Protein backbone atom coordinates (compact mmCIF):
# COMPACT_ATOMS: atom_id res chain seq x y z
CA UNK A 1 0.00 0.00 0.00
CA UNK A 2 1.36 3.40 -0.98
CA UNK A 3 1.16 6.33 1.42
CA UNK A 4 1.36 9.94 0.31
CA UNK A 5 1.75 8.86 -3.32
CA UNK A 6 -1.82 8.84 -4.54
CA UNK A 7 -1.10 11.80 -6.79
CA UNK A 8 -3.59 14.12 -8.40
CA UNK A 9 -5.00 14.26 -11.91
CA UNK A 10 -8.19 12.83 -13.32
CA UNK A 11 -10.34 10.46 -11.27
CA UNK A 12 -12.26 7.56 -12.81
CA UNK A 13 -15.02 5.35 -11.46
CA UNK A 14 -16.71 2.14 -12.45
CA UNK A 15 -19.30 -0.21 -10.97
CA UNK A 16 -19.00 -3.86 -9.99
CA UNK A 17 -22.15 -5.93 -9.54
CA UNK A 18 -21.43 -8.17 -6.56
CA UNK A 19 -23.63 -10.71 -4.75
CA UNK A 20 -23.90 -8.12 -1.96
CA UNK A 21 -24.88 -5.21 -4.16
CA UNK A 22 -23.19 -2.71 -6.43
CA UNK A 23 -19.62 -1.70 -5.57
CA UNK A 24 -18.27 1.66 -6.72
CA UNK A 25 -14.54 1.69 -7.54
CA UNK A 26 -12.51 4.90 -7.91
CA UNK A 27 -8.97 5.19 -9.24
CA UNK A 28 -6.62 7.56 -11.01
CA UNK A 29 -4.08 6.56 -13.62
CA UNK A 30 -1.75 5.04 -11.01
CA UNK A 31 -3.60 3.92 -7.90
CA UNK A 32 -6.84 2.45 -6.62
CA UNK A 33 -8.27 5.04 -4.22
CA UNK A 34 -11.74 3.89 -3.15
CA UNK A 35 -14.10 0.94 -3.25
CA UNK A 36 -17.45 0.99 -1.50
CA UNK A 37 -20.77 -0.78 -1.39
CA UNK A 38 -24.00 1.18 -1.84
CA UNK A 39 -24.25 1.66 1.92
CA UNK A 40 -20.75 3.16 2.10
CA UNK A 41 -19.65 6.65 1.12
CA UNK A 42 -17.30 7.02 -1.85
CA UNK A 43 -16.31 10.64 -1.43
CA UNK A 44 -14.19 10.83 -4.58
CA UNK A 45 -16.83 9.28 -6.83
CA UNK A 46 -18.78 12.51 -7.25
CA UNK A 47 -15.90 14.16 -9.11
CA UNK A 48 -14.82 11.07 -11.08
CA UNK A 49 -15.45 10.28 -14.74
CA UNK A 50 -17.43 7.11 -15.36
CA UNK A 51 -15.94 4.28 -17.36
CA UNK A 52 -17.97 1.25 -18.37
CA UNK A 53 -17.04 -2.41 -18.47
CA UNK A 54 -17.66 -2.29 -22.21
CA UNK A 55 -15.01 0.40 -22.61
CA UNK A 56 -12.61 -1.56 -20.42
CA UNK A 57 -13.18 -4.70 -22.50
CA UNK A 58 -12.77 -2.80 -25.77
CA UNK A 59 -9.55 -1.08 -24.76
CA UNK A 60 -7.95 -3.71 -22.53
CA UNK A 61 -9.26 -6.97 -23.97
CA UNK A 62 -10.55 -9.82 -21.83
CA UNK A 63 -7.40 -10.83 -19.94
CA UNK A 64 -6.26 -9.33 -16.66
CA UNK A 65 -3.45 -9.87 -14.22
CA UNK A 66 -1.01 -8.39 -11.78
CA UNK A 67 1.39 -7.26 -14.48
CA UNK A 68 -1.28 -5.27 -16.30
CA UNK A 69 -3.00 -5.66 -19.61
CA UNK A 70 -1.90 -4.92 -23.12
CA UNK A 71 -4.00 -2.05 -24.37
CA UNK A 72 -5.49 -1.58 -27.79
CA UNK A 73 -5.82 2.20 -27.86
CA UNK A 74 -4.58 4.28 -30.75
CA UNK A 75 -1.68 6.69 -30.33
CA UNK A 76 -4.06 9.63 -30.26
CA UNK A 77 -6.02 8.36 -27.25
CA UNK A 78 -5.25 9.59 -23.79
CA UNK A 79 -2.51 7.61 -22.04
CA UNK A 80 -3.76 8.53 -18.58
CA UNK A 81 -7.23 7.18 -19.30
CA UNK A 82 -5.71 4.02 -20.77
CA UNK A 83 -3.70 3.45 -17.60
CA UNK A 84 -6.84 3.98 -15.53
CA UNK A 85 -8.76 1.51 -17.68
CA UNK A 86 -6.05 -1.10 -17.18
CA UNK A 87 -6.06 -0.53 -13.42
CA UNK A 88 -9.85 -0.67 -13.27
CA UNK A 89 -9.77 -3.97 -15.17
CA UNK A 90 -7.43 -5.38 -12.54
CA UNK A 91 -9.73 -4.18 -9.74
CA UNK A 92 -12.80 -5.73 -11.36
CA UNK A 93 -10.85 -8.95 -11.86
CA UNK A 94 -9.87 -8.90 -8.17
CA UNK A 95 -13.52 -8.78 -7.14
CA UNK A 96 -14.33 -11.59 -9.60
CA UNK A 97 -11.72 -13.74 -7.88
CA UNK A 98 -12.83 -12.75 -4.39
CA UNK A 99 -16.49 -13.57 -4.87
CA UNK A 100 -15.48 -16.83 -6.57
CA UNK A 101 -13.70 -17.81 -3.33
CA UNK A 102 -10.21 -17.64 -4.87
CA UNK A 103 -8.59 -15.63 -2.02
CA UNK A 104 -6.93 -12.91 -4.14
CA UNK A 105 -4.08 -11.01 -2.50
CA UNK A 106 -4.79 -7.27 -1.98
CA UNK A 107 -1.20 -6.64 -3.00
CA UNK A 108 -2.21 -7.51 -6.56
CA UNK A 109 -3.46 -3.92 -6.70
CA UNK A 110 -1.63 -0.59 -6.26
CA UNK A 111 -3.58 0.79 -3.30
CA UNK A 112 -3.30 4.41 -2.17
CA UNK A 113 -6.22 5.24 0.13
CA UNK A 114 -6.28 8.83 1.29
CA UNK A 115 -6.07 9.45 5.03
CA UNK A 116 -3.95 10.63 7.95
CA UNK A 117 -0.69 8.93 8.90
CA UNK A 118 -2.43 7.20 11.80
CA UNK A 119 -5.23 5.88 9.60
CA UNK A 120 -2.67 4.68 7.07
CA UNK A 121 -0.95 2.68 9.80
CA UNK A 122 -4.23 1.08 10.85
CA UNK A 123 -5.17 0.26 7.25
CA UNK A 124 -1.77 -1.36 6.77
CA UNK A 125 -2.54 -3.56 9.78
CA UNK A 126 -5.82 -4.58 8.16
CA UNK A 127 -3.92 -5.84 5.11
CA UNK A 128 -2.06 -8.27 7.37
CA UNK A 129 -5.24 -10.09 8.46
CA UNK A 130 -5.42 -13.39 6.50
CA UNK A 131 -8.43 -14.36 4.43
CA UNK A 132 -11.02 -16.08 6.61
CA UNK A 133 -9.40 -14.92 9.86
CA UNK A 134 -10.28 -12.10 12.23
CA UNK A 135 -8.61 -9.86 14.78
CA UNK A 136 -9.82 -7.37 17.37
CA UNK A 137 -9.64 -3.61 17.66
CA UNK A 138 -7.55 -4.07 20.78
CA UNK A 139 -5.02 -6.28 19.00
CA UNK A 140 -4.59 -3.70 16.24
CA UNK A 141 -4.23 -0.96 18.85
CA UNK A 142 -1.44 -2.96 20.48
CA UNK A 143 0.38 -3.41 17.18
CA UNK A 144 0.12 0.28 16.30
CA UNK A 145 1.27 1.32 19.80
CA UNK A 146 4.39 -0.83 19.48
CA UNK A 147 5.22 0.66 16.08
CA UNK A 148 4.80 4.17 17.49
CA UNK A 149 6.85 3.23 20.58
CA UNK A 150 3.92 4.03 22.84
CA UNK A 151 2.83 2.19 25.96
CA UNK A 152 -0.74 1.83 24.72
CA UNK A 153 -3.17 3.00 22.06
CA UNK A 154 -6.90 3.59 22.24
CA UNK A 155 -8.96 0.82 20.66
CA UNK A 156 -11.62 3.47 20.07
CA UNK A 157 -9.19 5.51 17.97
CA UNK A 158 -8.39 2.38 15.98
CA UNK A 159 -12.11 1.79 15.53
CA UNK A 160 -12.47 5.25 14.03
CA UNK A 161 -9.70 4.55 11.53
CA UNK A 162 -11.15 1.14 10.66
CA UNK A 163 -14.55 2.73 10.12
CA UNK A 164 -13.09 5.26 7.69
CA UNK A 165 -11.37 2.67 5.49
CA UNK A 166 -12.11 3.90 1.93
CA UNK A 167 -11.26 0.64 0.14
CA UNK A 168 -13.82 -1.85 1.39
CA UNK A 169 -13.27 -5.63 1.13
CA UNK A 170 -9.85 -5.22 -0.54
CA UNK A 171 -8.54 -3.61 2.65
CA UNK A 172 -10.45 -6.04 4.87
CA UNK A 173 -11.90 -3.95 7.69
CA UNK A 174 -14.72 -6.50 7.90
CA UNK A 175 -12.25 -8.88 9.58
CA UNK A 176 -12.06 -6.75 12.73
CA UNK A 177 -14.42 -7.75 15.55
CA UNK A 178 -15.00 -6.81 19.16
CA UNK A 179 -13.00 -8.54 21.87
CA UNK A 180 -16.17 -10.35 22.94
CA UNK A 181 -16.92 -11.58 19.42
CA UNK A 182 -19.40 -8.83 18.60
CA UNK A 183 -19.66 -8.02 14.89
CA UNK A 184 -19.69 -4.31 15.53
CA UNK A 185 -18.64 -1.20 13.67
CA UNK A 186 -18.91 -1.86 9.92
CA UNK A 187 -19.85 1.08 7.70
CA UNK A 188 -21.31 -1.24 5.09
CA UNK A 189 -23.79 -2.70 7.56
CA UNK A 190 -23.47 -5.56 10.03
CA UNK A 191 -25.40 -7.92 7.78
CA UNK A 192 -22.82 -7.33 5.04
CA UNK A 193 -19.98 -7.88 7.50
CA UNK A 194 -21.56 -11.18 8.56
CA UNK A 195 -21.98 -12.31 4.95
CA UNK A 196 -18.39 -11.41 4.03
CA UNK A 197 -16.96 -13.39 6.95
CA UNK A 198 -19.22 -16.34 6.18
CA UNK A 199 -18.17 -16.18 2.52
CA UNK A 200 -14.53 -16.41 3.62
CA UNK A 201 -15.22 -19.43 5.80
CA UNK A 202 -14.60 -17.76 9.15
CA UNK A 203 -15.73 -19.58 12.29
CA UNK A 204 -19.10 -17.87 12.70
CA UNK A 205 -19.88 -19.70 15.95
CA UNK A 206 -17.48 -17.30 17.68
CA UNK A 207 -19.42 -14.16 16.69
CA UNK A 208 -22.74 -12.51 17.37
CA UNK A 209 -24.64 -9.51 16.04
CA UNK A 210 -25.16 -6.79 18.67
CA UNK A 211 -28.76 -6.01 19.57
Predicted regions and their residues:
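…primarily DNA-binding HTH/wHTH and HhH modules…
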Residues: 179-211
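Major-groove DNA-recognition helix of helix-turn-helix-type DNA-binding domains
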Residues: 162, 170
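Catalytic nucleophile loop of clan PA
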Residues: 176
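Short cysteine clusters
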Residues: 173
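Basic nucleic-acid-binding alpha-helical/helix-turn surface characteristic of O6-alkylguanine DNA
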Residues: 2-149, 199-211
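Short, positively charged loop/turn segments that connect secondary-structure elements
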Residues: 145-159
Amino acid sequence: METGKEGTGMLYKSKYKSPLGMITIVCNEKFLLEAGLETQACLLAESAQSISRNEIATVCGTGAGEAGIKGKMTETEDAGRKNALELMKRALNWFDLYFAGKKPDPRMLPLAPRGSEFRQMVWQELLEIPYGKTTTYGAIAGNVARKLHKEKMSAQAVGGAVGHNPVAIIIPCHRVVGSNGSLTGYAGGLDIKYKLLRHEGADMDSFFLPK
